[in-house]
Regions:
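Internal catalytic-core helix/loop-beta-alpha segment
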Residues: 107-122
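Structural scaffold elements adjacent to functional motifs in cytosolic proteins
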Residues: 129-131
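Substrate-contacting helices/loops that form the catalytic groove of nucleic-acid
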Residues: 177
Length: 306
């Protein structure tokens, strides 16, 4: 049966997150759904996978509940194993901003739809896209002319301000995967004196679905085993914009350095994986440390890698 992945969020005041967590876990288990759901007093943020029928039942159940009506669900084709298990947790925030203390229900940027943004590109309107994703996410796909956040974690958002000061009186559009981070990121810019701040409604995924290979190049990074999602990738207009860290050839295949104390997330082509092990290592030192490590000895006790 065809699998489907749902990406969704909602900022809404939840009085008893633990109760909602338990309800979410029970609902997902009853529908054989796997994925990650975060519940907090500020709302819910989730990505789940199941059959098309079961994910649609999940949406129906959410609409009938107390808190989660009128959520915009971003749907994409699953592979049946996007997630190894179900994780439903209560956390202080659904997107960790820590000390920034931004409440999107009180302050956030104006919404711009995928259609409006596409029109702006076509009409060559003056505007500036700021990609609020982590730095490793946009190396596989990005909007034309975008300004990178340059951050490794969303809670480092303050580091974005110095590179954007010249845009305080310009039209700025914040973008992210599904929209949840831009709710806070756009609000953060507003409270810091930016005068014309927008956020891409429903995120990059929705734009790519409606306008594949038009002003967004490459593939979209996602936080599950698929790692990247593309739309109409057989179209001659589709570009592979990622580059192998080692040889700089076009690639959009993400790997982790195999060494336990590194695990750097990066892009590598198949030709540049270690010939002896088939794994990715950042450098000779990482491989040597991995060979000596206890984890390697437990996993491959009979092999002596040089």
């Amino acid at each position: 049966m065809q699998s489907q992945v749902l990406l969704y969020y909602k900022y809404v005041a939840i009085s008893d997150p633990e109760k909602v967590r338990n309800e979410q876990r029970a609902l997902c288990e009853s529908l054989n759904l796997k994925g990650r759901i975060i519940v907090a007093k500020e709302g819910i943020n989730g990505t789940i996978e199941g059959t098309v029928a079961d994910t649609e039942k999940y949406i129906t159940a959410m609409e009938e509940g107390q808190y989660f009506k009128n959520i915009s669900y971003k749907k994409s084709e699953g592979n049946g194993h996007a997630f190894p298990k179900l994780s439903v947790r209560v956390r202080p925030e659904i997107v960790t901003a820590k000390k920034l203390d931004i409440d999107p229900t009180k302050v956030t940027g104006k919404y711009i739809s995928a259609e409006q943004l596409h029109d702006w590109f076509v009409s060559k309107k003056e505007f500036y896209i700021v990609d609020m994703r982590n730095d490793y996410e946009y190396i596989s796909g990005y909007f034309e002319g975008f300004i990178p956040s340059g951050i490794q974690n969303f809670y480092d958002l303050e580091q974005v301000l110095p590179r954007l000061q010249h845009l305080k009186d310009k039209t700025v559009v914040t973008v992210c995967t599904g929209g949840v981070r831009c709710e806070k990121a756009s609000g953060f810019l507003v409270v810091n004196g930016f005068n014309d701040v927008y956020q891409l409604k429903d995120g990059i995924q929705t734009y790519m679905e409606q306008y594949p290979n038009e002003h967004f190049k490459g593939k979209l990074y996602v936080f599950d085993s698929r790692l990247t999602v593309g739309f109409n990738t057989d179209d001659p207009k589709h570009e592979v914009v990622g580059r192998c860290d080692y040889c700089q050839k076009p690639s959009d295949t993400y790997v982790n350095c195999e060494y336990n104390f590194c695990h750097r997330h990066h892009i590598a082509c198949e030709d540049c994986l270690d010939a002896e092990t088939g794994f990715a290592f950042c450098n000779k030192e990482c491989k040597e440390n991995w060979v000596k490590s206890d984890s390697r000895k437990k996993k491959y006790p009979q092999q002596n890698f040089i």
